Amino acid sequence: MAAASATSTDFVRFALDEGVLRFGSFKVKSGRTSPYFFNAGLFNSGASVGRLAQFYAQALVDSGIAFDMLFGPAYKGIPLATATAVALAGHPAMQGRDVPFAFNRKEAKDHGEGGTLVGAPLQGRVVIIDDVITAGTSVRESVEIIRAAGAEPAAVLIALDRQERAGPDDALSPHSAVQDVAKTYGMPVVSIASLADILALLQGDAQFAGNREAVLAYRGKYGVV
């Protein structure tokens, strides 16, 4: 499930301007050599994270998904959930609603409040917020944490859907990691933008048009139908 096209296009341009989205030749986590690279960790200033959170908030509002709170899986999801909650608090569609959020620690704390969870108690319908889905490990762990607390995972909200098939080259799945997550947990995965949005920008922008053939070839080999 992608966000509105105007928002998606704006986000791709924003990612390029911030150096988060780059073109070239990159060895990615899956072991593949990709003609583009998306590193959300480079949204690393107050202004860039603030604007990023506005994109997350808008994508969630546009999705129409009913939710009660946000959850950010450690570590990248922590600032994303926090900033998105702030952005939602100021979003006109929320009509003044104050959305709670929580996140987990990788290591349990044995003093103070203790445990692995920080923030609001997990309850109701919870949206998991992360940057991308590669293998789905973070989502699986988040779902287990949310269900263990008696709450319901409502959706996953990510920045970019690479729209590529999961698995090694000699045993490619017909589905992407995003599709597998949606099917396994029976909940939607909402992305601010996708590979299709990147290709749309490459087609319409002379500055980056030279990268389009390489990205198309990559999609032809690994892209989901």
UniProtKB/Swiss-Prot annotation:
Cellular component GO terms, alphabetically? cytoplasm
The protein here is known as Orotate phosphoribosyltransferase
Single Gene Ontology MF annotation: orotate phosphoribosyltransferase activity
The record's family statement is:
Belongs to the purine/pyrimidine phosphoribosyltransferase family. PyrE subfamily.
Which gene name does the record give? pyrE
* Organism listed in the record: Bordetella petrii (strain ATCC BAA-461 / DSM 12804 / CCUG 43448)
Q: Which NCBIfam families match?
A: pyrE
Q: Which GO terms describe its biological process?
A: 'de novo' pyrimidine nucleobase biosynthetic process; 'de novo' UMP biosynthetic process; pyrimidine ribonucleoside biosynthetic process
* Top-level taxon of the source organism: Bacteria
| SUPFAM superfamilies noted in UniProt | PRTase-like
Cofactor(s) recorded for this entry are: Mg(2+)
Main function:
Catalyzes the transfer of a ribosyl phosphate group from 5-phosphoribose 1-diphosphate to orotate, leading to the formation of orotidine monophosphate (OMP).
Keyword list, A-Z: Glycosyltransferase, Magnesium, Pyrimidine biosynthesis, Transferase
Catalysed reactions, as listed in the record: orotidine 5'-phosphate + diphosphate = orotate + 5-phospho-alpha-D-ribose 1-diphosphate
